[in-house]
Amino acid sequence: MSQLSENLKKARGSIVFLIGITLAFGTVFGLEQWKPGKVKMMTAANVIEIDSDASIPLRKQRNLSSLELDMAKTAWKYFDNNTQDNGLVNSVHNYTAATLWDTASYLLALISAYELKLIPKNDFDQRSRLVLETLAGLPLFEDKLPNKSYSTLSASMTTYTNQQTERGVGWSAIDIGRIMVPFNVYVWRYPEFTPLVEKVLLQWQLDALVKDAELIGADVDEQGNTLYLQEGRLGYEEYAAKSLLLNGIDLSEALDYSRHFEYVDIDGVRVGTDLRTPDQFDALNFVVSEPYVLDGLEFGWDRYSRSLSYRVYQAQEARYKKTGIMTAVSEDNIDQAPYFVYNTVFADGKAWNAVTEKGEDASEFRSLSSKASIGLYALYDTDYTQKLFNRISDNYSSDNGWYAGIYEASGKSNKALTANTNAIVLEALRYIQLGPMIQIGRFASTQKTSPEG
């Protein structure tokens, strides 16, 4: 009891604020009336179908097997090999740049590794303190918010091609939203780091992220003008907004799944998509596994994302049953030009579209994603997710971590090694044993630590 009291005392500066947010969540979710079976939420824009938990084969929490624990140890090797002296981690093996999304992935991998007892407390503390201190000292785009990319060597602002830039190239609201997830874990579970988290956030003008309750990103055009644009599409938009809401930011519009929503039929499954097309809104729009997998692993979903996520999973299983092609798709780095591909359930009006960041066809690089495979395996207990797990379980470097995926056409490994892939593998395996990352008030009582034989 004395340790609990001490932790509460350390966190008192944040508890009053977070209690208010918790009450806000209680008000929102209290308005949702659960009914067995499938129900429909009537909205002005559309009807969102809600599947009951009983109809979704969710994986039950259990201890990791010895094989799964070894997989987690393999994932951690990536971070052992790619951490710089300032605490930042390379986004790609030996590539000395990182976005805030990559840094968030590292922090969540670090928390996962510690909670799975892969690293000792002093290592966790030292790594956490080092990266938080570096984040608190980052130069900011227009002195407001973190730039889209930084050198992991110098912590200076860079372009996406890792060229140093004094001004910066803008900020990503989605990336900033993601890093709020580990920040909230630190505040609630490791309150000794609350002052450092506050030190970071006091540097950032979070109000610049929002306009009319929507997420706003910043970019720089060819003339050097700063452009402020709505950021996020179905899945990612709500995921990032959810984490920012925990910090008292009004993002009620961004959290409304129904605003730009419609279903499309993908191999007999009604999958939710975003009506905001690239030609109208000058932004790419994809349906992929990742935002729904992360929402499940980190938040345990809400009733809408739980159903939308399950539809995305079902479509991928349906493609496998129809074609015999193992399917678990997401965006991934690849080990050859163009080096980054969106392998999608649906994009630009096409099912199973694979495109580059510029929207160009990349079908020849369509892949089975390691992070999507293991993420889906962690969330859903089905014969198909077991097949995904088995297919991907040897797709790694014993020295450097998990490869990004397996190419469909050749069956060869996509040997890109990234922070994001290895972080999601760690998060997924942690989820199997300990449940969602953000579990206020019940983490300590449910924590398990010993693997099965």
Where in the sequence are the language-model features?
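Ser/Thr/Asn(+Pro)-rich, low-complexity disordered segments
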Residues: 2-453
